[in-house]
Amino acid sequence: MKTENTRIPLISIKNLSRSYPDSKRKLFDKFNLELNKGDFLVVTGKSWSGKSTLVKFLIGQLKAPKKTLFYKLEDMADFSDAEIQRYRRKIGSMFQDYELIHTMTPQENIIYPLLLEEVPLTTIKTKYEAVKEIIDLSSIQTSDIKRLSGGEKQKVSIARALIHAPDFIIADEPTGNLDNESTMQIAEILIRANKLGNTIVLVTHDTALLEFLRKNANIKMLELIN
């Protein structure tokens, strides 16, 4: 018996148009995008090209018009506030400023989302050990967050994004505050995570990082031009 091999995209954007605030100038004009499981999508573009706005749509911070933004074929314009919150819990996010809790150790920061969801401690331990297979945390997991370097803080941020096995990870300019060596370390972690099946959306304007990813990862490029 013949079966159809249908792939449901995680995210679909169809003919999305949006103008700059207080302007008729188009930020997006009939914009289309499809994000599938296992993708490593790299989004680039100059300032004011729409990168930040795209991230806001993807994390559910901005509401798109009906029939333009879909999560697993469901129109997100129809999502209630509670459904948006559930959707956000299925996303891992990491940003340039890390967003870590300074009164917690790195390990506590990483497992905190699971504690909020009342995940059993045995499951938390298993998930934490799985993350450590991707990121070497042995030298920093009980350290004082305030004493960590930028690269070490970003490792904690990635681990926290990965630990609840999200549908996809949004990394918005994650290397913006890092030196070249730390940037390459973060890139290698993202590549390892993607090779293990994690879906990545990386927003960056770092040319050295882009060149490294082109040579070492199977990426899809999206350049926003405005």
Report the location of each language-model feature.
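Conserved ABC transporter NBD signature motif
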Residues: 67-75
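Helix-to-loop junction immediately C-terminal to a conserved catalytic motif
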Residues: 59
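Catalytic Walker B motif of ABC-type/P-loop ATPase nucleotide-binding domains
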Residues: 169-172
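Conserved ABC ATPase signature
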Residues: 144-148, 152
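Conserved catalytic motifs of ABC-family nucleotide-binding domains
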Residues: 165
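Short coil-to-helix segment of the ABC ATPase nucleotide-binding domain corresponding to the Q-loop/switch region
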Residues: 104-111
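Conserved ABC ATPase "signature" region
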Residues: 75, 122-140
